[in-house]
UniProtKB/Swiss-Prot annotation:
InterPro entries: CmoB, Mo5U34_MeTrfas-like, SAM-dependent_MTases_sf. The lineage of its organism: Bacteria, Pseudomonadati, Pseudomonadota, Gammaproteobacteria, Enterobacterales. Disulfide bonds: none annotated. It comes from Escherichia coli O81 (strain ED1a). Its EC number is 2.5.1.-. This is tRNA U34 carboxymethyltransferase. Belongs to the class I-like SAM-binding methyltransferase superfamily. CmoB family. One of its GO terms (molecular function) is transferase activity, transferring alkyl or aryl (other than methyl) groups. The keyword tRNA processing applies.
Length: 323
């Protein structure tokens, strides 16, 4: 059973304590009524993992844990088998005691694009919206963050996160809650808020930007990463039934239009930090994610287009400040 008591105890002592007015009841409701049919199977995989305290832990350059003495072949096989029970692994990679989880996404490449543009994360309390398996939260901790809180309603991601946490010595500097941002009160408590790979899935993107703003302290920093298309400040793509085989893609603005959206929501010091085409080296099928990936979603005769004929995925990073 995944227990959130440590997180409650942690925030009871800090500026997030007012969250306890609503959070425990929400989590209790989720535990009672909303668990996925496979959740027990996934949580069992976490439970059966060994508790290991890493002798060497690198969260600055990667997510890598090593023991003082190499694990036996049997121990490594046990860890690998249990982690494979949590497939598909989409966000990573992770290197854990000789088990190398080669995830669909090279999330480390995204982090390398984002990190140089951020305010120093040292000592910061961070919210990561749509955090997936929590890979980037561990990198935030590696960059000096005091506390990283992730929210993502996908329950497999929660179990993946808890599995990695257990293999990192039950590290309590990062926590994942199975919630969507619409379930959070306006906490106004985070120094930095990340929303990466979420905006295009929202039916109301401006509402999402307001929700992000409501989580920031005054002078806090927003890090927004999302799909964009080429064009001027008035260019927005509204895909038909699917975009790159995804049904739940609603709005893809140009980077300049997105800058205007942020301005309209009251953000200042808005800058476009990076624009990059997503490659089939960064997102691809692996033995830890064996179903279709980006190469299957692009036009086989023109990789500059999706199978539906839209521009192929391009992602921008924008940084903004809440005044």
């Amino acid at each position: 059973m995944i227990d959130f008591g440590n997180f409650y105890s942690l925030i009871a002592k800090n500026h997030l304590s007012h969250w306890l007015e609503t959070l425990p009841a929400q989590i209790a409701n989720w535990q009672r009524e909303q668990q996925h049919g496979l959740f027990k199977q996934w949580s069992n995989a976490v439970e059966f993992l060994p508790e290991i305290k890493p002798y060497h832990l690198d969260l600055l350059h990667s997510v890598t844990a090593e023991s003082e003495e190499p694990l036996s072949a049997g121990q490594i096989k046990r860890i690998e088998t249990l982690m494979r029970n949590l497939m598909p692994w989409r966000k990573g990679p992770f290197s854990l005691y000789g088990v190398n989880i080669d995830t669909e996404w090279r999330s480390d490449w995204k982090w390398d694009r984002v990190l140089p543009h951020l305010s120093d994360l040292t000592g910061r309390t961070i919210l990561d919206v749509g955090c997936g398996s929590g890979y980037h939260m561990w990198r935030m901790i590696g960059a000096g963050a005091h506390l990283a809180v992730g929210i993502d309603p996908t329950q497999l991601f929660l179990c993946q996160f808890e599995a990695v946490r257990k293999l990192l010595g039950n590290d309590q500097r990062a926590h994942l809650l199975p919630l969507g941002i619409e379930q959070l009160p306006a906490l106004k408590a985070f120094d930095t808020v990340f929303s990466m790979g979420v905006l295009y899935h929202r039916r109301s993107p401006l509402e999402h930007l307001w929700q992000l703003k409501d989580q920031l302290v005054n002078e806090g920093e927003l890090v927004l990463e999302t799909l964009v298309i080429d064009g001027d400040e008035n260019t927005v793509l509204v895909p038909g039934d699917r975009y790159a085989q995804m049904r739940n893609v609603y709005f893809i603005p140009s980077a300049l239009a997105l800058k205007n959206w942020l301005k309209k929501c009251g953000f200042v010091d808005i800058r476009i930090a990076d624009v990059s085409v997503t490659t089939t080296e960064e997102q691809r099928r692996t033995e830890w994610m064996v179903t279709e990936s980006l190469a299957d979603f692009l036009d086989p005769h023109d990789p500059g287009k999706t199978v539906e004929g839209y521009p192929a995925p391009k992602r921008a990073v924008l940084i903004a400040r809440k005044p």
